[in-house]
Amino acid sequence: YQINTLMTTNGQAPFVTLFLRLDDEDEYIDENALIVEEVLRQRLEGIKNEAGVYVTPAFPKLIYVLDENNCLKGGKYDYITKLAVRCSSKRMYPDYISAKKMKENYEGNVFSCMGCRSFLSPWKDENGEYKFEGRFNQGVVSLNLPQIGILAKGDEEVFWKLLDERLAICF
């Protein structure tokens, strides 16, 4: 993945999360396991910076799903979980999520959070099916209140007008 080679105009990398799940119902689970293993190996190694030092990249964020097949109880993919733990001990990531708990809370469904740790509130379509993908999550919005205050030049009415304008952009 080459997400870390992309930059915005202010020097930020795109906020991307990789949801690393080994689903027994996935017909390509073994191939998926190879991909998850390689992503973890690359993260464990780190990315070489300008000084030649391997550092921990902030993105993509990694979320590793613990399930019956990889929860260190003799499952087929326990070796990948051990790699994930090594990776976390050195690079702070991946974060972990329990498929068992998600299934309990969401009628058997397991799905990725958006961005860092933001979960959309549950929503079902007209057929009563959960819809987790393709939905928008605005997430966190920052407002620069000191800037609004400076622009208002002490005029409380102008402050509230500017604040209302900025808030309108948020949604």
Q: Over which residues does each language-model region extend?
A:
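Conserved catalytic cores of very large enzyme subunits
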Residues: 1-171
